[in-house]
């Protein structure tokens, strides 16, 4: 009986050993064959066995191999590596993603983005709502913008934002929100000005009355600065300002030019759009950093301008010559504070009675001249005086095309009440192409642009 029991036990042991041997043979041969058939090398198969990944391998995974052989390998992130299968070694980036997102979150993201886009997420804050992020990606926004908008906009704001066509620069929307505009006002503004103008409003100032203005059927964006100025000057309501400005009631044919000097602001920002006029004064020590001499073929006499203004002028002058066979020249460019002071005093002396009010109607006091910026030019047509420019072929061409090169006619007709100067056909100002296009589109003066934009 004991012998029979011993035989039974031995049989069980042998059976178990046989099963174990079969499993071992399977693991060593058949399982390995499955992995090698997928393309893994014997060394890679050993690593897969080492981390017990056999049951999770369904295909050759280059990202896993990169990770297993990388000095950045982190065993706790093995299942993150398995989510990727890229020919690029993203091991370090995957490690960083594991610190931001759970496995389930990353799986969801990978249904929205490809590997390269997903790796880009390491450069941004964690996505606060993946479902909302997907809506933005579906609207063709970039990964960066989609993350920013998802994390910035509240749920209701995002839903309203998504009703807009895809914006060229969605940061304009968030910039306007940051300045204090509500979502409905921003959408109304977009509807009023259109996509092209809206894309240029990132430095648009905050005006508490804009929402009410946009609701007025007579509102005209081109008159916005004048509405606001009229409200400030007259203390009237939005509706009254729109009515009176639309009726041109703010127009003054012959303003008191000396009164422009009553409240003077010191200019500290000397960017391309710097406003220098009778109310905004440059320091007597200000000299532009990048002044260069205008080459002889493009000037009437020795003149200097800021480099960018020169380059734009040369292109404009060449194109004018090609179009109408007439050459535009710089008659006067940069003038120092001292030169402006001397010129103004000469005008006073020439007036006979020393009456500055007469001189203020056509000249600027020292520090108040745009010529000191190195961005303003008085022009003439070759072989003609600047005073005759209005009668020249090149004048018509320049007036029509100047904005394409970043220049604006600085003192247009019927705007002296804004600019402090009567119409001057030969005086142009460089502000850069984008700003010049906007000013041309809405028929603004630089004063109006400056009133509306930072």
Question: PLM features: what roles do these ranges have?
Answer:
Residues 25-333, 337-454:
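Extracytoplasmic cell-surface/polysaccharide-interacting catalytic and binding patches
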Residues 2-18:
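N-terminal Sec-pathway targeting helices
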Residues 17-25:
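Hydrophobic helical h-region of N-terminal Sec-dependent signal peptides
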